[in-house]
Each structure stands twice: as structure tokens, then as C-alpha cells.
């Protein structure tokens, strides 16, 4: 598994399972083993390849795990990963749940995270999906306390940006921050642009202007136009996922 970056050297057991499943499916479709190996070795969980899917940022004094997990199974998998990573400091989590889930589903998200972290910050999404502004954080906090987490280890910060900022400012060298995010691009930028107190701002060198690009190949333009026609009527979200618009039967 050390040759499969998406498994984080085998610590991300759910991605070990995903890699095995993907390899088996590809092989059953007749894809050559060399191509399967190449795919597994070159795919990683950077924000650019898989936004919101176990992204790691370790350029702060602490490590940040960033994920879009929004159900109990996803939260449990990431909490398990947080336990498997080598952490010399504290484990801090920014926890959330979609507002259109049942109360018991939201409480279950809290339950599977309970006992895995030193500090919990409970928040809501920008879109509360019909719930009151503080309802989701309150249910999460309730689930944590019912599972035995001390009240002193639980914070309720409703706003996503404020919750993430609080976690970042709380982070110390050796800590691990697990951030469950909803507004992916905004939250990722917030994490990578954060500057801990006392950290000098990096100077930005003046970019070197590149040579003008040659005129586009007519065949390439034709292929691009054909692709745009095929994609007409679809919707792409900020994660890069493409959906077909719903049509009446």
C-alpha cells in the first residue's frame, strides 16, 4: 500500500478497500495490469485531484485533514484515520451534519466521533436545509455528551468560517486538525492562507511572463466544441462532480 498514495501508506483503510475494489473492477473490464498499477500510483488525495476527499495540508506547524464527509460512515472512517496517524499533540475536529438528516442521524455522526478527539467544534452548514440556525450544532453537542465526551471539550460555533478559524488558531505544533467542510473551495483557501501567530508572511516573487501561446489547432478546437455540445444540459459543482439535469418522464 505504500505505492498507493491515496491510502496514506495503508493508514486510510477505507481507501485500501476502495483501491482493491477499483482494481478488481478495472481488471474485470479487461484493463491491463500495468495501466491499473499506473492509475493507483499516480492518483492521490490532493485538493486538485479529489477536492474534499481526505485532503492533507501539512505546511502549518500542525497537520490538517480536510474532508466532505457528511454521514456517519464517512465520519467514522475519517475518525479511524485520525487515530492511525502519528500525532504528538492533540486531535481537534470541526464536526458538522447536513440539516435535512433525521435527528438520530445527526446524533449518530456525533456518536461515531466521540472519544476519538481531544476537542470538538460543532458547526452547521451555510444552508441549514430547513433547520433553525443552532439546531445542528446543538444536536451534535448532545450526541457527544450522551456518548461521554466532557462538556469542556465541546464548542458550538455555528458559522463554518468562524469554526474553522477557531480550530486553526487552536492548533499547536504536533496537533492534528480534522475539518469536515461544506463550502469546499472557500474552506480550503481559508486553511492554506491561514498564518499562525508569529509566522512571517512569505514573499511572493514576481512571475516570469511566458511566451505567447501558438495559435490553436483547428482539430483541437473542433474536439473542444464537440465536448461542449455533449456536456450541454449538465451541471458541475465545485467538487468537479458532473450531474445531468433532471428531466420529466
Regions found by a protein language model. Give the residues of each.
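Flexible glycine/proline-enriched surface loops and loop-helix/loop-strand junctions
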Residues: 5-6
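ATP-dependent carboxylate-amine ligase
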Residues: 9-14, 21-34, 38-249
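Acidic-glycine-rich active-site phosphate/pyrophosphate-binding loop
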Residues: 1-2, 53
Amino acid at each position: 500500500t505504500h505505492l498507493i498514495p491515496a491510502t496514506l501508506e495503508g493508514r486510510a483503510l477505507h481507501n485500501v478497500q476502495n483501491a482493491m475494489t477499483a482494481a478488481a473492477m478495472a481488471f474485470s473490464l479487461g484493463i491491463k495490469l500495468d495501466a491499473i498499477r499506473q492509475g493507483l500510483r499516480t492518483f492521490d488525495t490532493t485538493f486538485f485531484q479529489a477536492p474534499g476527499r481526505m485532503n492533507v495540508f501539512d505546511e502549518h506547524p500542525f497537520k490538517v485533514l480536510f474532508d466532505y464527509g457528511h454521514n456517519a460512515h464517512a465520519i467514522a472512517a475519517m475518525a479511524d484515520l485520525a487515530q492511525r496517524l502519528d500525532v504528538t499533540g492533540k486531535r481537534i475536529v470541526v464536526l458538522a451534519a447536513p440539516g435535512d438528516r433525521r435527528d438520530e442521524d445527526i446524533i449518530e455522526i456525533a456518536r461515531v466521533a466521540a472519544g476519538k478527539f481531544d476537542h470538538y467544534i460543532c458547526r452547521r452548514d451555510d444552508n441549514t436545509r430547513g433547520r433553525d440556525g443552532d439546531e445542528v450544532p446543538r444536536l451534535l453537542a448532545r450526541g457527544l455528551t450522551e456518548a461521554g465526551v466532557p462538556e469542556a471539550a465541546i464548542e458550538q460555533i455555528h458559522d463554518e468560517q468562524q469554526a474553522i478559524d477557531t480550530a486553526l488558531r487552536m492548533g499547536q505544533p504536533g496537533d492534528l486538525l480534522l475539518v469536515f467542510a461544506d463550502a469546499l473551495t472557500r474552506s480550503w483557501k481559508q486553511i492554506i492562507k491561514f498564518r499562525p501567530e508569529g509566522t512571517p508572511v512569505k514573499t511572493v516573487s514576481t512571475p516570469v511572463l511566458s511566451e505567447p501561446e501558438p495559435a490553436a489547432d483547428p482539430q483541437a478546437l473542433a474536439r473542444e466544441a464537440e465536448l461542449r455540445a455533449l456536456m450541454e444540459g449538465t451541471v458541475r459543482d465545485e467538487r468537479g462532480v458532473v450531474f445531468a439535469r433532471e428531466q420529466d418522464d
